[in-house]
Amino acid sequence: MNKLIFIIICLGIVDKTISSDFKSYNDGIYSFTYDNICSFKNSIRDQDVYELYYVQAPLLYATYGNLLEKINAYHSGIVLYNKNNGPNITIDYYAIPSFEATLFPKSIIKDSQGNYNITWDTHGLIEVTNYINETYWNKRQLIMYDLSGIQIKQYLSWAPIYNKTHTFYNLFNIESDLSISNSSKIYKNSSTCDDFVWASFDVLYKLGGTIASVQSDPQRDDIKLFISSGEPKIVDYNDSIKRNQIASFFNELKDFANLGKNKTALEIFNELITFFNGYFYCYIDGEYYEMKLSKQNPISFTYLPSPIPIGKRNFNEIKKLGFCK
């Protein structure tokens, strides 16, 4: 079964809100987000030396434990290990209020005129903690070493800028159908925990981090929608006909999530393939996009090695906060 379909079914089976991360911390452990990160940044000592680890945890761990690890579905982040017995750092980008909220609207309500109103509650948030949850982050790989406290401060000054330009958590890369042309054209990029991690690798490399010797590039999840209709079209939400079409689409998608309770995996898969061959809608950065998915290969979910930075470093490309009050 396609991994995304399996995840959607899992979301439908569970009736409670699902957090994308495990947020239970002991006393003395503090969390900082992009709007108050300076409080944490100013506690880091310039002379400290850090190692950077790429860490992963099974997706929806708080609800399913290690189950989704079996299909290589992970939440990812970065751990900065302090070699001078100073504070360790964990930083990740996650979906709030839940992973489910990235796929389904908060509410779809029909008014007295028979028209729908759709409400979303989904965002992407960077969180920094002075703690490493060894139980939760059960996979790790050394990526860089010899990062100074000064470089870590500079990195933490970059993170709020990233979050302000990536306020929505978006699961999908949207690309042209490979069967139509020899090369794929990317129309929309995803904005996920993995995307944040790889952006962090790039920034920390430019700041002077030394790449560790690894046998292969680290692996990451990647979900792609392949479309045959050309560039996705922004839908006019104020057009009641279009809005009702969007509402019907997401109601159907939610119904598919609930099918896992009384249908076989093969039945669900076949129905979803038929569904995906029609028009598809995505909610990205506060806009609705309409597209026609490829009949041959509408969607892919991969877990493959992805390159880490090499070559020339350009420190001046990094946008960051100039100072912290």
Swiss-Prot record:
GO terms for biological process: lysosome organization. Keywords: Glycoprotein, Signal. One of its GO terms (molecular function) is hydrolase activity, acting on glycosyl bonds. The keyword Phosphoprotein does not apply. Glycans are attached at residues 88, 117, 133, 163, 182, 189, 238, 262. Residues 1-19 form the signal peptide. InterPro entries: CLN5. Transmembrane segments: none annotated. Belongs to the CLN5 family. This is Cln5-like protein 2. The gene is cln5lb.
